[in-house]
């Protein structure tokens, strides 16, 4: 009921009764929907400017580290042209023997400059990594905070792979590329400026030839920018699809094996994997083409420089040392320019990742307009008054004008055919689903007037789909108790849930890890652990959502005994599939097509020979 299950995208049903093709239908739909949603706002300049502002406002929070890193990068940049300048005295004076002290001075100068540059680069890189990781921690914190606050409906619509990618890949790309942009933009720009200054000082005529070709290189880079961004966005989408397919392959491995789904899963994976390869190759092609085109432009400039330099040398205006120094500075300028032209690709990747991250951060959180807390002592009285609800695009109400009262300590069971509205109705009590009409009252207080924290702190849940965390048994039992739970309370809860004997037989007892998805426990053990968790919370209202429907008879017997202890003195709403488990309920409410068609104790409903009797007799014959 309340669990988030990854699955195929909403609306992925084969039209006209056509068999669903997992290799194409849903993946194509998901990719096209993702692309349409993500492509729409990306091209506008205001959106890009806003993304830049949001990313670098977070980076700017660590301005002290940034300023120090920039100063260190300036120091490293200052050493770059100095190495080229040394070439002139080395060739003109050093080899001629005109200045003997150059024998030791020039080598030491070279070593000293390279050492200084290495120190500056190390500490600037360290500081930028420190900034990036702090920003990444903050962004992921924002994302997780928003994730926890999303409405339940968003999880049912969401794509697990896409969400995971936002945390693991996109968030890292935002901070990684953001600091890369700073590094390249500052360090390489300073290097280029310093080298151009040296080149102009050495020979303004030769330098002008180089400067003429720079706008051409920039124009080529801009031409590739838009294409790179579109390709990068599609690559992000396909990475999310690949994560989803692999995740479903892992989660559903038993079903795949038992239903011989190998070929279907291979088709799904190959379809996404092939598309991802195509997008990766398009991106690689664009990246690969950008560099040689830029280099061709620069090589034309170099050829012109050599021609002019030879002319000046023949007239005696240029020495060998001066030309070597000029060419050394010119050779050093190519890599910084290359990195600056490649910066466009990193900027686009950063913007695509930022768009993905802030799409999650900007999602509307769960509405929590209530201001009241439940008055103490909480009794556990629950009342539904003419409650109705219809899901978007549905042709009828899922719940229609349902009214009933549950007195404190009573047990009321909701039964009916699949799709009758049982789960939707119970989901309204913790406000996972909001009613379209009517009121729900908790101790005579409308639940919309209560804060979510106050409302949910007085509710406990035991469902068919037990969610346990990858932690110890004690941590899972004490989860939600509002503080540290001592071992004695944990053991008491486990004993009441008929699980203590099993836990004591484990090597680490209550401190035994349960593993991911509680894989080390059986279905019945997971259910009883959930019951122990509910006992520790000790909420006055309990929701049981088909808590025994997936268990064998022996496990059901043990769990049912534990549930009876849990239900004592608590208001309990039970959604039951096996009607044999609700015979002792104070009242049974029978739903059909979202409406109450019968209600009363078990014996009266059987005697009435209505829908409940029909469902009960059908199950009795099956059993």
From Swiss-Prot:
- Tell me the first and last residues of the signal peptide: none
Q: How does it sit in the membrane?
A: Multi-pass membrane protein
Source domain of life? Bacteria
One cellular component GO annotation, for this chain's record? plasma membrane
Cellular compartments annotated: Cell inner membrane
MF terms in GO: ABC-type oligopeptide transporter activity; ATP binding; ATP hydrolysis activity; ATPase-coupled lipid transmembrane transporter activity
Per UniProt, ATP binds at: 416-423
Q: Which residues form the ABC transmembrane type-1 domain?
A: 67-349
Entry keywords, A to Z: ATP-binding, Cell inner membrane, Cell membrane, Lipid transport, Membrane, Nucleotide-binding, Translocase, Transmembrane, Transmembrane helix, Transport
Q: Which SUPFAM superfamilies does this one have?
A: ABC transporter transmembrane region (SSF90123), P-loop containing nucleoside triphosphate hydrolases (SSF52540)
Alphabetical list of Pfam families matching this protein? ABC_membrane (PF00664), ABC_tran (PF00005)
Stretches that traverse the bilayer? 66-86, 103-123, 190-210, 290-310, 317-337
EC class of this enzyme? translocase
Query: What EC identifiers does the entry list?
Result: 7.5.2.6
Q: Where is the ABC transporter domain?
A: 382-618
Q: Which reaction does it catalyse?
A: ATP + H2O + lipid A-core oligosaccharideSide 1 = ADP + phosphate + lipid A-core oligosaccharideSide 2
Briefly, what is this protein's role? Involved in lipopolysaccharide (LPS) biosynthesis. Translocates lipid A-core from the inner to the outer leaflet of the inner membrane. Transmembrane domains (TMD) form a pore in the inner membrane and the ATP-binding domain (NBD) is responsible for energy generation.
Stored NCBIfam families: MsbA_lipidA (TIGR02203)
Q: What does the UniProt entry state concerning the protein's domains?
A: In MsbA the ATP-binding domain (NBD) and the transmembrane domain (TMD) are fused.
So what family is this one in?
Answer: Belongs to the ABC transporter superfamily. Lipid exporter (TC 3.A.1.106) family.
Record note on quaternary structure: Homodimer.
Q: Per its record, how is this protein called by name? A: ATP-dependent lipid A-core flippase
């Amino acid at each position: 009921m309340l669990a988030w299950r990854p699955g195929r995208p909403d609306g992925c049903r084969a039209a006209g009764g056509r068999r669903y093709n997992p290799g194409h239908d849903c993946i194509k739909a998901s990719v096209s929907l993702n692309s349409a949603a993500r492509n729409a706002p990306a091209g506008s300049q205001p959106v890009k400017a806003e993304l830049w502002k949001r990313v670098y406002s977070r980076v700017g929070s660590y301005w002290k580290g940034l300023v120090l890193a920039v100063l260190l990068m300036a120091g490293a940049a200052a050493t770059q042209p100095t190495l080229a300048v040394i070439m002139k005295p080395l060739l003109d004076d050093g080899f001629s023997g005109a200045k003997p002290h150059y024998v030791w001075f020039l080598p030491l100068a070279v070593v000293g400059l390279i050492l200084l540059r290495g120190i500056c680069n190390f500490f600037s890189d360290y500081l930028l990594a420190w900034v990036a990781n702090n920003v990444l921690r903050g962004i992921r914190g924002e994302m997780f905070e928003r994730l926890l606050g999303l409405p339940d409906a968003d999880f049912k619509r969401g794509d697990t792979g896409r969400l995971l990618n936002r945390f693991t890949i996109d968030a890292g790309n935002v901070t990684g590329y953001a600091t890369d942009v700073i590094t390249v933009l500052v360090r390489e720009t300073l290097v280029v400026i310093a080298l151009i200054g040296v080149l102009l000082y050495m020979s303004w005529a030769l330098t002008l030839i180089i400067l003429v070709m720079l706008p051409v290189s920039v124009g080529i880079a801009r031409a590739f920018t838009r294409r790179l961004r579109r390709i990068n966005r599609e690559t992000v989408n396909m990475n999310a699809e690949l994560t989803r397919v692999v995740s479903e392959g892992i989660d559903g491995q038993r079903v795949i094996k038992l239903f011989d789904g190998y070929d279907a899963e291979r088709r799904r994976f190959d379809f996404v994997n092939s598309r991802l390869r195509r997008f990766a190759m398009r991106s690689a092609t664009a990246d690969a083409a950008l560099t040689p085109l830029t280099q061709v432009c620069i090589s034309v400039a170099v050829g012109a420089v050599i021609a002019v330099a030879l002319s000046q040398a023949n007239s005696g205006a240029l020495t060998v040392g001066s030309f070597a120094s000029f060419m050394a500075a010119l050779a050093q300028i190519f890599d910084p320019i290359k990195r600056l032209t490649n910066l466009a690709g990193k900027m686009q990747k950063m913007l695509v990742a930022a768009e993905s991250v802030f799409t999650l951060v900007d999602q509307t959180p769960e509405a929590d307009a209530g201001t009241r807390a439940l008055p103490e002592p909480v009794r556990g009285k629950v009342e539904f008054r003419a409650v109705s609800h219809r899901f978007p695009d549905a042709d009828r109400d899922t719940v229609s004008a349902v009214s009933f009262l549950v007195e404190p300590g009573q047990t009321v069971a909701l039964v009916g055919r699949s799709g009758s509205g049982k789960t939707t109705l119970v989901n309204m009590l913790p406000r996972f689903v909001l009613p379209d009409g009517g009121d729900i009252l908790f101790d005579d207080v409308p639940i919309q007037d209560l804060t979510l924290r106050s409302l949910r702190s007085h509710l406990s849940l035991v469902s068919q789909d037990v969610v346990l965390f990858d932690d110890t048994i004690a941590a899972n039992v004490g989860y939600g108790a509002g503080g540290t739970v001592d071992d004695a309370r944990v053991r008491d809860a486990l004993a009441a849930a008929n699980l203590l004997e099993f836990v004591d037989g484990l090597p680490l007892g209550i401190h035994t890890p349960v593993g991911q998805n509680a894989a080390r426990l059986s279905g019945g053990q997971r259910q009883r652990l959930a019951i122990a968790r509910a006992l520790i919370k000790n909420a006055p209202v309990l929701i049981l959502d088909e808590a025994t429907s997936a268990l064998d008879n022996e496990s059901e017997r043990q769990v049912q005994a534990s549930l009876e202890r849990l239900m004592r003195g608590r208001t309990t709403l039970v959604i039951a599939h096996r009607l044999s488990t609700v015979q002792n309920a104070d009242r049974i409410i029978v739903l059909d097509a979202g409406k109450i068609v019968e209600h009363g104790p078990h014996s009266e409903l059987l005697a009435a020979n209505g829908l409940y009797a029909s469902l009960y007799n059908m199950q009795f014959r099956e059993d």
